[in-house]
Amino acid sequence: MKRIHSLAGILLVLGLIQSSCRVLMQEADPSSSLEADSTLKDEPRELSNMKRHSEGTFSNDYSKYLEDRKAQEFVRWLMNNKRSGVAEKRHADGTFTSDVSSYLKDQAIKDFVDRLKAGQVRRE
């Protein structure tokens, strides 16, 4: 399938080169522009439809290629961020740490009050 798309792309590029050469030749020789106009009018409708189809196919394939490329770059970016060793803290990590700190602080206050009641702490 990729070979067909590559072939369509090559044919499209060759067609563009041929048409640009035709334009350059017409600019160089004004009498040939009349002949070129008549050949364009005589061009069969099927050929123009084929050109339009090949251009559409090429642009569609190119768009898919760009989307795939962006997806690959995004995956690489994700992988590089994980490999960099910088662990980003999540919100849950912060709340867990805060909860543990609050618990330990409350426990320390409770222990201090218990020692005060027992008379183990000196008052100065």
Curated annotation (Swiss-Prot):
Provide the induction entry. Answer: Produced in the A cells of the islets of Langerhans in response to a drop in blood sugar concentration.
- InterPro entries per the UniProt record, alphabetical: Glucagon, Glucagon_GIP_secretin_VIP
Residue ranges for the region (Disordered) are 28-54
Query: Which SMART domains does this entry report, sorted A to Z?
Result: GLUCA (SM00070)
Q: Which organism is it from?
A: Lophius americanus
Give the GO cellular component terms, alphabetically: extracellular region
Primary role: Glucagon plays a key role in glucose metabolism and homeostasis. Regulates blood glucose by increasing gluconeogenesis and decreasing glycolysis.
Q: Does the keyword Signal apply?
A: yes
Entry-linked PROSITE patterns: GLUCAGON
Pfam family for this entry, one = Hormone_2
Propeptide residues?
A: 84-88
Q: Which UniProt keywords apply?
A: Cleavage on pair of basic residues, Hormone, Secreted, Signal
Q: Main site of residence?
A: secreted
> Signal peptide position in this chain?
1-25
Give an example GO molecular function.
hormone activity
- Entry protein name: Glucagon-1
Question: Where is this chain compositionally biased, Basic and acidic residues type?
Answer: 38-54
List localization entries.
Secreted
